[in-house]
């Protein structure tokens, strides 16, 4: 199944449509990871989120008919051209290094908890 857009480059209007689609996806889930199945950095981020007990939505761009367009739209929107591209509660976090650094600083779990991706068990301690 081919792309809905002709050629390799999207028009400004086509880009706007795909950016809006990406924004709708990001706003629909507490945590979104734009990924590719063969990407080791993507695997690290997904593994970390799983180990932390987070619920998250993964979009494997290499398995989507419009994955290339979505990645281009993410680049246009966030300035980040690579995957993984992670969003928490609608906010752009970044790629693997940024997610790992945020976790190392002790800031990732609170972000995930605030987003509702991890159950807040602090009242049960």
UniProtKB/Swiss-Prot annotation:
Domain Glutaredoxin: 19-119
Pfam families to which the protein is assigned, alphabetical: Glutaredoxin
Assigned GO CC terms: endoplasmic reticulum; peroxisome
Protein name according to UniProt: Glutaredoxin-C1
Biological classification of the source: Eukaryota, Viridiplantae, Streptophyta, Embryophyta, Tracheophyta
Keyword tags: Cytoplasm, Disulfide bond, Electron transport, Redox-active center, Transport
Predominant location category: cytoplasm
Family: Belongs to the glutaredoxin family. CPYC subfamily.
Disulfide linkage: 39-42
Transmembrane segments: none
